[in-house]
């Protein structure tokens, strides 16, 4: 074996070994995410009607609604983050904010529909 081949081999062995350590973030099946979002959205809708006291501001009720749907949000976060938890904190913050926005808008729409 020539010196060049030995040198190339000594460089490739650590590289190939490190490739086994690469993080693989596999995306969940799209239908699973849709199903989990639908479950979360249904939870938000149920709890808007159940928790709205018609006195508190919409954002306060929205926060209570999101808290009531924490299990649905966590299931969605876990599915998107995958088994390795890749970017779980960031995904959790985004889903929490999305849920809060949706819940607050649902409170506003719910109140408007009661008035008409």
Give a label for each model feature.
Residues 18-20:
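C-terminal motif of bacterial Sec signal peptides marking the signal peptidase cleavage site
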Residues 32-77:
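Short N-proximal segments of mature Sec-exported proteins
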Residues 22-25:
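Bacterial signal peptide processing site
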Residues 1-12:
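Bacterial N-terminal signal peptides that target proteins for export
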Residues 62-116:
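Compact alpha-helical subdomains of small soluble proteins
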Residues 4-5, 58, 88:
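Structural motif marking the loop-to-transmembrane transition
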């Amino acid at each position: 074996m020539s010196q060049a081949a030995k040198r190339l081999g000594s460089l490739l062995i650590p590289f190939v070994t490190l490739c086994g350590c690469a993080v693989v973030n596999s995306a969940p099946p799209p239908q699973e995410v849709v199903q989990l979002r639908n479950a979360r959205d249904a939870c938000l809708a149920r709890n808007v009607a159940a928790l709205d006291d018609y006195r508190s501001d919409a954002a306060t009720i929205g926060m209570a609604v999101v808290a009531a749907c924490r299990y649905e949000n966590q299931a969605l976060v876990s599915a998107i983050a995958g088994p390795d938890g890749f970017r779980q904190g960031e995904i959790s913050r985004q889903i929490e904010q999305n849920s809060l926005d949706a819940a607050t808008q649902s409170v506003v729409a719910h109140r408007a529909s009661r008035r008409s």
